[in-house]
């Protein structure tokens, strides 16, 4: 798999931060408004969302006027799904387990305790039918989901008492 080609495609398709040059507007560039579930400059997740948006603008070579909004700047963090689903913005960057209230299946497209490792998850998405399931689920809300990174397998939990049974 060509990593650069994949990253370029994911960046152009998925979306996130910074304003494109005014020349993009003058050239008739398409507006791409991206909202995030994370605060601006939040280490790791927030800063990577900003970098992704900047890269989309750069790789689009004037085709996109990219406008990025961190959590709370355009909509609240947990309103980003509905913002994009309604058509008010074109993309969001977040973790799909935030949307389990809409459908519990969204958890499987992020990370769950004791779940798959990042390589296992990527293999399932690309080769094991995961993307097709994700397309079906996200498509029912008018969205197209794309993987834009991974924080890895989530921990099983932190408890103040020893667990001795499933109960």
Report residues per predicted region:
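N-terminal export signals
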Residues: 5-26
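Immediate post-signal peptide segment of exported/extracytoplasmic ligand-binding proteins
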Residues: 19-37, 57-65, 139, 161-167
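Extracytoplasmic "Venus flytrap"
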Residues: 33-51, 71-76
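Contiguous mixed-secondary-structure segments that line small-molecule binding/active-site clefts
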Residues: 54, 95-167
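Alpha-to-beta junction loops
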Residues: 62-64, 80-94
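Generic structural signal for residues in well-ordered beta-strands
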Residues: 66-68, 145
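Short helix-initiation/N-cap motifs at beta->coil->alpha
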Residues: 68-82, 151
């Amino acid at each position: 798999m060509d990593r650069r080609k994949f990253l370029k495609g994911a960046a152009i398709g998925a979306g996130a931060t910074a304003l494109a040059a005014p020349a993009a507007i003058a050239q008739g560039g398409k507006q791409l408004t991206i909202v995030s579930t994370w605060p601006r400059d939040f280490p790791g997740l927030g800063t990577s969302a900003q970098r992704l948006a900047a890269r989309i603008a750069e790789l689009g070579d004037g085709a996109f006027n990219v406008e990025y909004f961190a959590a709370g700047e355009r909509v609240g963090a947990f309103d980003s799904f509905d913002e994009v689903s309604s058509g008010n913005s074109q993309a969001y960057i977040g973790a799909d387990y935030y949307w389990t209230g809409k459908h519990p299946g969204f958890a499987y497209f992020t990370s769950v305790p004791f779940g798959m490792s990042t390589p296992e998850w990527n293999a399932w998405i690309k080769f094991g039918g995961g993307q097709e399931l994700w397309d079906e689920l996200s498509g029912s809300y008018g969205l197209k989901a794309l993987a834009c990174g991974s924080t890895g397998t989530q921990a099983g939990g932190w408890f103040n008492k020893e667990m001795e049974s499933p109960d």
